[in-house]
Regions:
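A Zn2+-metalloprotease active-site environment signal
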Residues: 1-213
């Protein structure tokens, strides 16, 4: 697919840019809370790889390897709170092992709401989209709701404003219809989803206020 080819041609690790440093700082703040939320019975070895590229994508693998494109932050002009919304959502997909039973057991969960499964394993060092990509299917609506709910809780615990989860989806939905937003084909930024997050805020805002830095 075009997205995969694009990802492969643009997969350049970025460890030095201001955007990369911001992503990694947010990731480090969320990590202890993701560890607390881990009920899989196996400790995760969380690791964030930042790729330089315009693609709007981020993903996590069961086990804790994560990746995010700088384009996500730069094109959507994400605040740190909004970056936390994206990372928290992906961490929750990985923690809940969504799609773990996909082909070969090797699974990438992506912000695209896609489960990308490779038959012969995924190169763990370059958490890229493997050439052996076999299947890509959307998460179920239920899994997406679970990832939203878990993600906003991680945000609040780490002192990020959970309201930012709403603004991320609003920014995405404004871009809907643009062909470069592959993630929205499987991950509609719909009103139902935004309303569900809004209903969680009364419980989460006090947690955020307490942990705000």
């Amino acid at each position: 697919s075009q997205v995969v080819q694009q990802a492969q041609s643009q997969r350049v690790l970025d460890n030095t840019s201001h955007t990369s440093r911001r992503i990694k700082a947010v990731f480090e703040r969320l990590k202890p809370y993701a560890n607390q939320a881990n009920q899989t019975g196996t400790p995760f070895n969380w690791q964030m790889n930042v790729f330089r590229g315009d693609e709007l994508n981020a993903w996590a693998m069961p086990g804790g390897k994560m990746a995010m494109y700088t384009g996500m932050v730069e094109r959507l002009k994400l605040t740190d709170d909004e970056i936390a919304a994206v990372i928290g959502h992906e961490m929750t997909h990985a923690l809940l092992e969504h799609g773990k039973k996909a082909i070969g057991g090797q699974v990438l969960t992506g912000l695209g709401g896609s489960i990308l499964a490779g038959a012969s394993g995924v190169d763990a060092n370059i958490v890229g989209l493997g050439t052996d990509l076999l299947a890509s299917k959307p998460f179920s609506r239920h899994q997406e709701s679970e990832a939203d709910a878990g993600g906003v809780r991680l945000m609040a615990q780490a002192g990020y404003n959970p309201e930012a989860a709403i603004s991320v989806w609003e920014k995405m939905s404004k871009l809907e219809g643009s062909s470069s937003i592959a993630i929205l084909s499987t991950h509609p930024a719909n009103q139902t989803r935004i309303n569900a997050i809004r209903r969680m805020l009364p419980e989460l805002m006090p947690i955020y206020q307490k942990n705000k830095r």
